[in-house]
Amino acid sequence: MKKRCLALLLTLVLCIGMAIPAGASQFQDVPDGHWASDAVDYVVEKGLFNGTSATTFSPDSGMTRAMLTVVLYRYAGSPAVTGTVASETPFQDIPEGAYYEDAVVWAYQNDIFPDWIVSQDGGDHNRTTFAPDSPTPRMDFAQMLYQFSLYLTGEAPAEAGEELPFVDVTQEALYQVLAAAYPYYLSDEADVAQIQAAVSWAYTQGIMNGTSATTLSPDRTITRAQVAVMLMRFDGAYGEVLLQQAVLALVNEARAQEGLAPLTLAQNLTQAAQVRAGELPVLFSHTRPDGRSCFTALAEAGVAYRTAGENIAAGYATPEAVVDGWLHSEGHRANILNEDFTQMGVGHVQAADGYGDYWVQLFVG
């Protein structure tokens, strides 16, 4: 059995940043103690959306369909899109060069939108009006986040398996909500089930709260503050998945430039890589803290392989930075561009030390 454990990055990057003052000093309408202040700081620092002025965030203002589409597109890393609105979507009310143009193409191509946004009648007739400035109901954003989680993970979120305490998300209530919000759309049981699955997932995952003990207000326009809070909570559940996908995309981009086949992200490899990442703050080495080889983590995760490699790094704050660091190190680059490797796992942890971020790539073939 061939096993390789290549050299560490010789220069570790020490990430020391200046803290940006939190919401109170930045936005006068989101003072310290505001229920969404931490979330507002989060979305602004992450670059998902900005204030409505230099000193205001407008937390209670509603979010339009175009705004929310752009926010999710940015969260996904603003991936390159192929085609245009005219060539890839049925929508005819989006001017060329609109700030949300690429976001709409991406969302349409990846099934982020609920059916009632893209279908005229609930059947095969496409809707030609996107209505970018229309306010977005809470149920629509829950549905878009649900679809976004599917986009990130490649699998539908697990069903909640518990009855919600809200009287306004019953089948009868949602039929009425859909009919009032989208009178052109002929909803059926499948549409109602979609909403129920999305809001149930969002509620049980702690992403969305009710507006009272017995109501979720699915038809109420979602506010900027509510979106900020939901995205911060979503990131707590799915943020690592997005980092893993970003590392994979960058690795495959480098492999494509060399004419190599892309790697796939394997769940059991990622499980092993995550274990290894958790060990690096204790011992930054290809040897585990208990003295065993790094590759014993593969066996523990049930990974079968003929050849394997590991890259590790510390101090890089983003997927782009760490992959660039690996690609500029001969041994790590050799792993990334190894034609014998077919699968990869990615691990990442943050530690309260000078390096902050610890990364692991595990490769097998």
Q: Over which residues does each language-model region extend?
A:
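Tandem repeat domain/solenoid detector
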Residues: 45-47, 224
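A short amphipathic alpha-helical interaction element
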Residues: 40-43, 72, 107, 145, ...
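Phosphate/pyrophosphate-binding loop motifs in nucleotide- or prenyl diphosphate-using proteins
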Residues: 47, 111, 206
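Functional surface patches built around histidine and acidic residues
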Residues: 232-365
